[in-house]
């Protein structure tokens, strides 16, 4: 029997902030603490039997936020890190540093505080990465725009795994899983972008375009989108401006997304398709004794 040299299945760096994001959530729209508590509990329930070490990056958080983590994680599996209201770029740099330097797990997870996970399903993303040598990154989130917009209207490689269809994709948010080796290989790109946008959230679409090398070699789309979809065109520009060495000389990394989704972004207009999320929210709250 071959023993793993890793003591955990997943290493997680979880960013949490006590203020609401720009998009209104589908539940607890006026109470970030309750929203964060629900999301973290859903993440814990999604892990099942996975062995997880978690770093909680508490950015300007009152003490009550720490208690959410200490109630759910054993002290030996939890590291609490406190930041005095720094920009998103700083905590993204910290996530990158933590997850590349740790040697506890070969699969790592960049987590944000506004994602809700389905119970017992997170292992599917972990197993998908472990069992697919060509997969570098994975998102637990089936983005609704993957199915409806011109940006994502291109060939996708698909693989059936764990009762889901996994598709290669262009981009995701700052919530994603990675093989530690792939993250180490792309570390310079991550840190450069996060440093360049230190006080703000870095441009995730531009970052993923540079890594996956999708949509960055199509000048026709660039000029067309410059008129109709400036965010897409602007992301292509930012990818070239900040990440041109990766685009020209780096290898093409792969990013995969599941359908149906494993998690959803807690923005009312951006929920993953095909799942009754309100039903899932109510079920999680009932299980936790919240209703």
Where are these regions (language model features)?
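Short loop/turn segments at strand-loop or loop-helix junctions that form parts
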Residues: 10-21, 59-60, 140-143, 258-262
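Conserved catalytic core of nucleotide-sugar-dependent glycosyltransferases
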Residues: 116-193
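Phosphate/oxyanion-binding active-site loops and adjacent basic polyanion-contact surfaces
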Residues: 28-39, 84-92, 117, 172, ...
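Short loop->beta transition adjacent to catalytic acidic/histidine clusters or analogous donor-positioning motifs
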Residues: 10, 46-55, 78-79, 106
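C-terminal catalytic/acceptor-binding lobe
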Residues: 5-7, 180-181, 185-291
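Active-site-proximal specificity loops/subdomain of glycosyltransferases
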Residues: 62-106
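Short beta-strand-to-loop acidic/aromatic patch adjacent to the donor-nucleotide binding site
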Residues: 105-116
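N-proximal low-complexity "stem/linker" segments adjacent to membrane-targeting elements
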Residues: 1-45
